[in-house]
């Protein structure tokens, strides 16, 4: 895509990784898919490093990156899909390779901001959420991230999804 009024193209990739379920074939499929995502991300970041197009990989990865990304870390860590060390390692590897987790970069070292709340119980009301929706930017694009917004509904009844939109403004 070309940003409005700009000449610099940006590749936008929409990604989805299903939730999985610990110790099931569904989780095995998820764990087989994460390296494929990582391989494509390695190609994209190398392209920008060689003077090519910047990329933005965004979507629902169904994995938290750290304790700051889930309200209830202790009862979930290594007990539920999305909070397993082997999943988290993939997301952190991408950041180690140079990808910018734009919302975390902009939000800083704080709890949240969450983008997903279970429909069950009082998760939404108590803001017991997970940050599992990301915008990963190649380094040059990530440096131009200026602000973000999580489009969380004001009330439970106003929700149209268990996820909230994650918007990031980039200066291009």
Describe the residue ranges of each PLM region:
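Active-site regions of metal-assisted phosphoester/phosphodiester hydrolases
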Residues: 1-172
């Amino acid at each position: 895509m070309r940003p409005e009024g700009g000449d610099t193209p940006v590749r936008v990739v929409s990604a989805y990784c299903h939730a999985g379920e610990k110790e099931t074939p569904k989780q095995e499929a998820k764990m087989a898919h994460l390296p494929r995502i990582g391989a494509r991300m390695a190609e994209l970041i190398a392209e920008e490093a060689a003077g090519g197009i910047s990329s933005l990989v965004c979507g629902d990865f169904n994995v938290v990156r750290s304790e700051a990304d889930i309200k209830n870390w202790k009862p979930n860590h290594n007990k539920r899909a999305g909070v397993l060390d082997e999943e988290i390692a993939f997301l952190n590897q991408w950041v180690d390779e140079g990808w910018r987790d734009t919302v975390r970069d902009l939000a800083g070292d704080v709890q949240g901001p969450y983008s997903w709340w279970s429909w069950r119980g009082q998760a939404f009301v108590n803001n017991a959420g997970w940050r599992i929706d990301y915008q990963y930017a190649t380094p040059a694009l990530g440096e131009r991230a200026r602000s973000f917004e999580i489009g969380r509904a004001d009330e439970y009844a106003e929700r149209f999804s268990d996820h909230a939109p994650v918007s990031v403004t980039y200066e291009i």
